[in-house]
């Protein structure tokens, strides 16, 4: 059997977790990552090509006989990187542009759910700020949610408690274009209350296999205060994702989404991330993502028993029905170490110490996000710097282990939340 060469596109903690998973596969003997980071370089040869440089990425894959390219990030998927690879006959894991719209346009995904009866919050789409304001003045119930239609680094969602806040939000998203063209269209949707749960899945266009559940912590500060971020920590599994919830979602949400995309002529191959809200009326879809979550990947992949390459190849080849996913009967918690001041303003280039503490420690992981090498020293290079993941027999044990391990790394402006997984105590 010829061993495989794999290219991973991206540079975050999610891509580090993917690289770690791929490195365990006996089918693989060479991993490249574009552009990668300091941690990924332990498993992969990092190449200085940006995630949005589609032609260069495809050239590289062709020239280096890459057998499979894995796209980690949302921007290139929504931009059509998969189509560029497929046009050259290169094997690539991820949805085409016409399917990545499931994440790329919130208005599209809301209309899809409405058309196919997939449970979600009530909403209206607007491309005219005056009409949006008129709706807010005449029909809105507060609190209400405003969402920029396009990609906005997970930050284009505003929860408005009053009409004044909502008016300011319309101005910010649609007139001041705080999120650029992502705000050309805006979704106004009813505010849902309940527990949030994330479920990741592999999809081959027809068949869907769900992974274990996880729960994210989006706000920057303890007590769910502060600004929305890309995610400050996660735990898996979610104790609130019961068998009953799973049954409901299998019946009304998961396969229904895959079938809806196929019926629209947009067969989805890759990862669908279901952001769910467990409401009093039952589970509803908050959002879809077309790739692994970050930091959800950092708690889900370490618990997966399968060879990730086998599963991804099954997706690309339309044979996912032959695969059963298996997860360890344990728990994992990830605490993000960020730069003080994230997500607004923060210093970069600060030296970090303590990585050797993770050597040969079973069940402890240090996934790199915003890191790079500078004169042989690992320094900070972003807002979210590292994801410290630990496993345990129970969620409480995993949480204690993860927080213990956060002490193993030092850097001057280290910041983290101290209440990741507090909901575990409420289960």
Regions found by a protein language model. Give the residues of each.
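Internal nucleotide-binding/catalytic subdomain
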Residues: 157-297
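Solvent-exposed alpha-helices and their adjacent loops that cap or buttress functional pockets
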Residues: 23-24, 39-41, 93, 115-117, ...
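ATP-binding N-terminal substructure of ATP-dependent carboxylate-amine bond-forming enzymes
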Residues: 1-97
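Short acidic-hydrophobic, aromatic-tinged amphipathic segments that line or gate anion-handling sites
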Residues: 46-52, 124-128, 160
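Generic C-terminus detector
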Residues: 371-375, 379-427
């Amino acid at each position: 059997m010829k061993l495989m060469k794999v290219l991973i596109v991206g540079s975050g903690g999610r891509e580090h977790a993917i690289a770690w998973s791929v490195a365990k596969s006996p089918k693989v003997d060479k991993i490249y990552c574009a552009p990668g980071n300091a941690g990924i370089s332990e498993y992969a040869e990092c190449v200085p090509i940006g995630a949005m440089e589609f032609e260069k990425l495809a050239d590289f894959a062709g020239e280096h006989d890459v057998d499979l390219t894995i796209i980690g990030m949302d921007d290139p998927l929504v931009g059509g990187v998969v189509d560029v690879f497929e046009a050259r006959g290169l094997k690539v894991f991820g949805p085409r542009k016409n399917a990545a719209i499931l994440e790329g346009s919130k208005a599209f995904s809301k209309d899809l759910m409405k058309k196919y009866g997939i449970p979600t919050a009530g909403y209206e789409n607007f491309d005219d700020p005056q009409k949006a304001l008129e709706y807010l003045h005449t029909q809105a119930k507060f609190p209400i949610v405003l969402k920029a239609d396009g990609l906005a680094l997970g930050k284009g969602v505003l929860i408005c408690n009053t009409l004044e806040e909502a008016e300011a939000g319309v101005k910010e998203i649609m007139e001041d274009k705080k999120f650029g063209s992502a705000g050309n269209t805006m979704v106004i949707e009813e505010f849902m209350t309940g527990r949030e749960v994330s479920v990741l899945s592999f999809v081959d266009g027809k068949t869907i296999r769900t992974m274990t559940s996880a729960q994210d912590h989006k706000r920057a500060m303890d007590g769910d205060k502060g600004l929305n971020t890309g995610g400050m920590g996660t735990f898996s599994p979610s104790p609130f994702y019961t068998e009953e919830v799973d049954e409901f979602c299998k019946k009304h949400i998961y396969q229904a989404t895959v079938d809806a995309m196929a019926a629209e002529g947009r067969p989805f191959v890759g990862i669908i991330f279901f952001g769910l809200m467990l409401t009093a009326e039952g589970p509803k879809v908050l959002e879809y993502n077309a790739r692994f979550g970050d930091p959800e990947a950092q708690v889900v992949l370490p618990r997966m028993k399968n060879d990730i390459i086998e599963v991804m190849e099954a997706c690309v080849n339309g044979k996912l029905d032959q695969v059963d996913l298996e997860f360890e009967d344990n728990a994992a918690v990830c605490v993000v170490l960020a730069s003080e001041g994230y997500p607004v303003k923060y210093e970069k280039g600060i030296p970090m110490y303590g990585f050797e503490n993770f050597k040969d420690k079973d069940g402890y992981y240090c996934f790199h996000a915003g890191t790079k090498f500078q004169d042989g020293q690992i320094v900070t290079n972003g807002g979210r710097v590292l994801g410290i993941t630990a496993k345990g027999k129970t969620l409480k044990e995993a949480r204690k282990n993860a927080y213990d391990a956060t002490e193993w790394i030092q850097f001057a402006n280290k910041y983290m939340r101290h209440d990741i997984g507090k909901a575990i105590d409420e289960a």
